[in-house]
From Swiss-Prot:
HAMAP family: Adenine_deamin. It catalyses: adenine + H2O + H(+) = hypoxanthine + NH4(+). Its cofactor is Mn(2+). Signal peptide: none annotated. The keyword Manganese applies. This is Adenine deaminase 1. The keyword Manganese applies.
Length: 594
C-alpha cells in the first residue's frame, strides 16, 4: 500500500476534477459513518481511490463508467478486527472467495498460524498471495511465537530481535495478540516487542480474557490499547473505562455479542464509538450458512443497536482503532474504494462489493475467477515426526493393577476447561480410558523435527465410545493433537496425518472413517469453502457416530493447546495449568490392587 509522488499527484488532480473519474456510482444512499448520516449521494472513483461524494456530475468524462445503484445503500467495506483466517481451514485465496461476497474487504490478522509452521519465509509467500486477492490483510506482528506458557515447540520463534526487523516492514501495522500472561510474567521477548512497538509508534493489540483490577492496570501500563476477549458486558465496561478500545467477538464457537453488546445497549450508548467487531475464528460452514461480518452486523441490529451504529462498529471504529483509517473505514475522498452495497440497513443483505474500485462480487458470488498460487515446499511442508505405535499413547505407571486418581481436563465449552477428578482402572501398568464415564486419552506430538516431544493426559466432554480423532491444525503451535478411547486407533490417526502431509481424521476399529487433507502447512487447504464445509460435516457426523454430541468436535479439540484459555490446556511439553502457567502430572494418586 505504498504511495508514489506521481500517483499522489494524479489522485489530487482527480479529486479536483481535473482528471475525470474512472467510475461513478449513481443513485444510491450513502451511509456516511463519519457524520452519522444516511442520504442520497453519488460516489466518484479514480482508479482504486474515492475522489468525491455527493453531487459528482462534473467528475464524469467520456470514458467514465457509470453504475446505476438506485435504491441501494453504500457503505464502507466491512472490517474483521481480529481474525485467525487459518482456523477456517481455508487458504487466504479460498477465504477471500468466501467472505468478500459477504462484504468483508479487510481483516486484521497476525497470520500467526502460518508463521508457527513456516516462519518468515512462509509469511512472505502469504503476503504475495494477499496482494493478488481482493481481501486486504492488515498484519500485526505476533508479540512472540509460541504464545504458550510454558513454551511449546514451533517451527519459528518470534523474538525481540525479529520484531526489530519486521516492525519496519510496510506490511506491519502493529503487534498482534499480546496475551496477558506474557505481560504478567514480564517475559523478556514480549517486553522487547512492546517497547519496540512503542518506539515505532505502532499500536499494540491485546488478548486479556477476564483481566480486571490490578491485573488489567498492569496490562494497560504495558501499552496495550485494544482487546477482543471479554466474557461479559461488565468486563467490557471496566476495560473501556480504563481506556481500552473493545472488539466484541462473535465466532463460530463463542457467541459473545448478545452479552457484550449490553455495554452499549444497557449501560452507556456513548461507548459504541470505541467498540468494534471481530469473528476471531470462523468455520467455512458458518460463512456459507450465516455470512461473515455482515452476519455480525445483523446480529448487533437484532440486539438493539441502531443500524448505522452497527455499521460504524464494523468499519470506521476498527479502522481508527488500528490506525488504518487513512486507507479504509469510510466512503470519503482519498480512501481506498472498498464499497459494499446492501438492500436495506435493517435486513442488511449484501448485493454487490467493490474492492480497490473494481466490482469483485455480486449476489453473494465472486465476479471473476480467483486462483490460489502454486505452493512451494515452504508451505507444502511435511510433518517431520516419526510414525507412532499404540504404545506411544498408553499412560504407563509403576503399579501393575489397581486404580489411578486422575485430573481430567473437562471441556464445558470451547473456551471453558475445568478440573474433573476421576478414578480410572490400571491394567498391566497402563491407565485405562473410561468411555462409560467420558474419559479419553489426549496427546500432542511435536511435528517440526525439533525435539520429538510427546505429551499424554486425560480429557472429558467428547463422549467418544470408541475410536480416535486427530488434527495437525491446532492453534497456537499447530503440533499434532490426537484424542481417543483406543491407543491403536490414536496411533493410526496420527500416522495417517504424517503420511498425508497433515489434515484432520476420524478413526474407529482400525479404519479411517473420514479425512480432510490440509496440505498448505498442514493447517489450510485451497479447496473452495463449499467443499471444506462438506468435508467438515462428514467429520462431525463421523464423530457423532462414535458418541460425540459436541457441535464441532474437532474445533473443540484443536483449541486444547491454547494456554491463554483457562483453566487447563495441553501442548507438546505436557498438560498445562493455565492459571499457574506450569505443566502438571495428571496422576494424582495410585492405588495398588488386584
Amino acid at each position: 500500500m505504498q504511495v508514489s509522488k506521481d500517483a499522489l499527484k494524479q489522485l489530487i488532480r482527480a479529486g479536483r476534477g481535473v482528471i475525470p473519474a474512472s467510475k461513478v456510482l449513481e443513485g444510491g444512499y450513502l451511509v456516511n459513518v463519519m457524520s452519522n448520516e444516511v442520504y442520497l449521494a453519488d460516489v466518484a472513483i479514480y482508479e482504486e481511490r474515492i475522489v468525491a461524494i455527493g453531487k459528482v456530475e462534473e467528475y464524469k468524462g467520456p470514458e467514465t463508467e457509470v453504475i446505476d445503484v438506485t435504491g441501494l445503500y453504500l457503505l464502507p467495506g466491512l472490517i474483521d478486527g481480529h481474525l485467525h483466517s487459518e482456523c477456517s481451514k481455508l487458504s487466504i485465496t479460498s477465504f477471500a472467495k468466501a467472505v468478500v461476497p459477504c462484504g468483508t474487504t479487510s481483516i486484521v490478522s497476525g497470520l500467526d498460524e502460518y508463521i508457527s509452521v513456516s516462519g518468515l519465509e512462509g509469511l512472505q509467500e502469504v503476503f504475495k498471495e494477499v496482494k493478488k486477492s481482493p481481501l486486504k490483510v492488515f498484519w500485526g506482528a505476533p508479540y512472540k511465537t509460541p504464545y504458550t506458557f510454558p513454551k511449546s515447540t514451533v517451527a519459528f520463534n518470534f523474538t525481540e530481535e525479529v520484531h526489530q526487523e519486521v516492525q519496519q516492514w510496510p506490511e506491519c501495522f502493529g503487534v498482534w495478540e499480546t496475551v496477558r500472561e506474557a505481560v504478567q510474567e514480564e517475559d523478556e521477548d514480549t517486553l522487547g516487542a512492546l517497547a519496540t512497538a512503542q518506539n515505532n509508534r505502532l499500536p499494540i493489540f491485546g488478548c486479556a480474557p477476564m483481566a480486571r483490577g490490578k491485573e488489567l492496570n498492569g496490562y494497560l501500563c504495558a501499552g496495550v490499547r485494544l482487546d477482543h476477549e471479554s466474557y461479559d458486558h461488565e468486563e467490557v465496561v471496566e476495560k473501556m473505562r480504563n481506556g481500552m478500545h473493545m472488539l466484541i467477538r462473535e465466532s463460530s464457537v463463542t457467541h459473545f455479542l448478545e452479552e457484550n453488546i449490553r455495554a452499549v445497549t444497557e449501560v452507556n450508548p456513548y461507548l459504541a464509538r470505541r467498540v468494534s467487531f471481530c469473528t476471531d475464528d470462523v468455520t467455512a460452514t458458518d460463512i456459507l450458512e450465516k455470512g461473515h461480518m455482515d452476519n455480525v452486523v445483523r446480529q448487533a441490529i437484532k440486539a438493539g443497536v441502531e443500524p448505522i451504529t452497527a455499521i460504524q462498529m464494523a468499519t470506521i471504529n476498527s479502522a481508527e482503532a488500528y490506525r488504518i483509517d487513512h486507507l479504509v473505514g469510510s466512503i470519503t475522498p482519498g480512501k481506498i474504494a472498498d464499497i459494499v452495497m446492501v438492500d436495506s440497513l435493517e435486513g442488511f443483505q449484501v448485493q454487490a462489493v467493490l474492492t480497490d474500485g473494481k466490482l469483485v462480487a455480486r449476489d453473494k458470488k465472486m465476479s471473476y475467477e480467483l486462483k490460489a498460487p502454486a505452493r512451494s515446499s515452504v508451505l507444502s511442508c511435511a510433518l517431520k515426526c516419526a510414525t507412532t505405535t499404540p504404545e506411544d499413547f498408553q499412560y504407563r505407571v509403576e503399579i501393575e493393577q489397581g486404580t489411578a486418581e486422575v485430573l481430567s481436563m473437562n471441556v464445558k465449552g470451547p473456551f471453558v476447561r475445568k478440573r474433573r477428578d476421576v478414578t480410572l482402572q490400571v491394567a498391566n501398568h497402563i491407565v485405562q480410558a473410561d468411555t462409560e464415564n467420558d474419559v479419553l486419552m489426549v496427546s500432542v506430538l511435536e511435528r517440526f523435527g525439533r525435539n520429538g516431544n510427546k505429551s499424554l493426559a486425560f480429557c472429558s466432554g467428547w463422549k467418544l465410545k470408541k475410536g480416535a480423532m486427530a488434527s495437525s491444525a491446532a492453534p497456537d503451535d499447530n503440533n499434532i493433537i490426537v484424542m481417543g478411547a483406543d491407543a491403536s486407533d490414536m496411533s493410526i490417526a496420527v500416522n495417517h496425518l504424517i503420511e498425508n502431509g497433515g489434515g484432520q481424521v476420524i478413526v474407529a476399529d482400525g479404519e479411517i472413517l473420514e479425512f480432510l487433507a490440509l496440505p498448505v502447512g498442514g493447517i489450510v487447504s485451497d479447496l473452495e469453502a463449499e467443499e471444506i464445509a462438506r468435508q467438515e460435516s462428514l467429520l462431525t457426523k463421523a464423530a457423532n457416530s462414535l458418541g460425540c454430541d459436541l457441535p464441532d468436535p474437532l474445533m473443540y479439540m484443536f483449541f486444547l493447546p491454547i494456554t491463554a484459555i483457562p483453566d487447563y490446556a495441553i501442548t507438546d511439553v505436557g498438560p498445562v495449568d493455565c492459571i499457574a502457567l506450569t505443566t502438571f502430572d495428571p496422576i494424582l494418586a495410585l492405588n495398588p490392587g488386584k
